[in-house]
UniProtKB/Swiss-Prot annotation:
Belongs to the aspartate/glutamate racemases family. InterPro entries: Asp/Glu/hydantoin_racemase, Asp/Glu_race, Asp/Glu_racemase_AS_1, Asp/Glu_racemase_AS_2, Glu_race. This is Glutamate racemase. It catalyses: L-glutamate = D-glutamate. The keyword Metal-binding does not apply. One of its GO terms (molecular function) is glutamate racemase activity. Pathway: Cell wall biogenesis; peptidoglycan biosynthesis. It comes from the Bacteria. The lineage of its organism: Bacteria, Bacillati, Bacillota, Bacilli, Lactobacillales.
Length: 271
């Protein structure tokens, strides 16, 4: 048993979709979350920048004595997961493999869509992961760069969001039966995405799928938390504390969250 917290990282508020599922499935676990809102979105960034920014977040979480790191960000997972895993002696999990595996199980037509940031689509990680498991599946990938900005600006229920989602997803409509939400921001737009794609299309939340793997790893390494009455989840953001709080408290349905501003640029765990 291990009562140290689980660390979650994301380029902004998107990883809160993973945090919500983690809190639901693993209520005894404490969370430390870092969202790099100041440098979001990561999608247009270079591979080198994304890796460097991911290390800033990883080192920040290590300074909080976490027992596991969850890359609750598809872009960071695509670019930096294997690099970080090689360097750390605690479990590190991403969100791409769980999402891909679930989509393979759910599709009936062997036609899967993937929507993600530009960097994730460029990396082709979802396509490669699915191809390794099943060569029979056709994967249609689509970058939706405007989605992250809509979520980060808390415009999910606006008319602009409805128009952007509808226009962005038009190339996939009628061509797939399963759609991977390949960015953890995207579940915050789920109602609009489902409406656009049609109710018959199965939406795969890659972050939610990852929580099942987190549970397996906690058991495997015997680092589950003891049942306890009091502990505090801590959320950190590199910019926009008030906006982050508004989105987090609404999405997690928890009031008075502990949310702080954090400086993580070139963060060194020895600080």
């Amino acid at each position: 048993m291990d009562n140290r917290p689980i660390g979650l990282l994301d380029s902004g508020v998107g990883g809160l979709t993973v945090a919500r599922e983690l809190l639901r499935q693993l209520p005894n676990e404490e969370i430390v979350y870092i969202g790099d809102t100041r440098r979001a979105p990561y999608g247009p960034r270079s591979r080198e920048q994304i890796i460097a920014f991911t290390w800033d977040m990883v080192n920040f979480l290590l300074s909080k004595n976490v027992k596991m790191i969850v890359m609750a960000c598809n872009t960071a997972t695509a670019m930096a997961l294997e690099i970080v895993k090689e360097e750390l002696d605690i479990p590190v999990i991403g969100v791409i493999l769980p999402g891909a595996s679930s989509a393979i199980q759910k599709t009936k037509t062997n036609k899967i869509g993937v929507i993600a940031t530009q960097a994730s689509i460029r990396s082709d990680e979802y396509h490669k992961t699915i191809a390794r498991k099943s060569s029979a599946i056709e994967v249609l990938s689509l970058a939706c760069p405007k989605f992250v900005s809509i979520v980060e600006s808390n415009e999910m229920e606006s008319e602009i969001a409805k128009r952007v989602v509808s226009e962005s997803l038009a190339p996939l409509v009628g061509k797939i039966d399963t759609l991977i939400l390949g960015c953890t921001h995207y579940p915050l737009l789920r109602p609009l995405i489902q409406e656009t794609m049609g109710k018959e299309v199965r939406l795969i939340d890659s972050g939610a799928e990852a929580v099942r793997d987190i549970s397996v790893l906690l058991n495997y390494f015997e680092i589950n938390a003891h049942e306890r009455k009091e502990f505090q989840h801590c959320f950190y953001t590199t910019a926009g504390v008030n906006s982050f709080r508004e989105i987090a408290e609404k999405w997690l349905n928890i009031g008075h969250l502990h949310i702080e501003h954090a400086e993580i640029e070139n963060f060194n765990k020895e600080k």
